[in-house]
Amino acid sequence: MKIISGNSNKTLSNKISKFLKSKLINSSIKKFSDGEIYIEINENIRGNSIFIIQSISSPANDNLMELLLCIDALKRSSAKNITAVIPYFGYARQDRKVAPRTSISAKLVSNLITKAGADRVVTVDLHAGQIQGFFDIPVDNLFSTPIFARHAKKKIKSKNIICVAPDVGGTERARALGKALNVGLAIVDKRRPKPGQSQVMNVIGNVKDKTCIIVDDIIDSGGTIINAAKALKTRGAKEVYVYITHGVLSGEAVEKIKKSVIKNLVITDTIDNQDKIKKAKNIEVLPISGLMGEAIKRISNSTSVSDLFK
């Protein structure tokens, strides 16, 4: 087993490498003057099982192309098999046609990764579980729920807790954390007038005098989560904590969160955004390297990955 890192999140790659006690493959990733990406593997990998770690985060197009070219380079270097470890699977939010003439980018990206030569994919908290079905190769979708549950049990002292889905689509995710914490569930009913905007219509469930934990997979502009937190406070919630796997945090998201009613936002390090959040006192980052490293180890040893979540 050998590991190679793309440029999207070298900090996470180094943590996973340290966890597995395996050095990263020596490689060169450069750009030509016109922006074309050039990748070269600088050591012999013939006959090895290779795990490439690369998030499809901002700049999403460059990082996706880097992933595809790296898979191709590994394939042409006679790797035995290639596992694409994609902590944050970008383009996953376009998983279906929401208008008559739109693309389904999640399916296209799945096709590209497979066609490039990947034999397996490992990712964390896919935006929609059915994206696994877009691939014709095995996909291991890891869950951050155990990490969040351990943190919440230590961090939140209240005995009157309820988990909240910020929209109907996130119900299963919130229910999973609620089950781990042995608490109930509420749902924020919202509509989205246009991308990046959300409007709360109703809150299903009693949140009065309760400590609310909003659970979601992605926080981008922050609008959905901030509006949900406001709605909960308006309906009598005592305080609002937020647990989200992927901190995209576009534009002014961090500033908006700092000024919001959110007591604490907890994200993982699937996306490298330390520079964005270093001055935000109410944003905390949990490491995902242990979970991902253990999954890689189990795949390499042909043992169960799903047992991690039992």
Model-derived segments and spans:
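PRPP-associated nucleotide enzymes
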Residues: 1-310
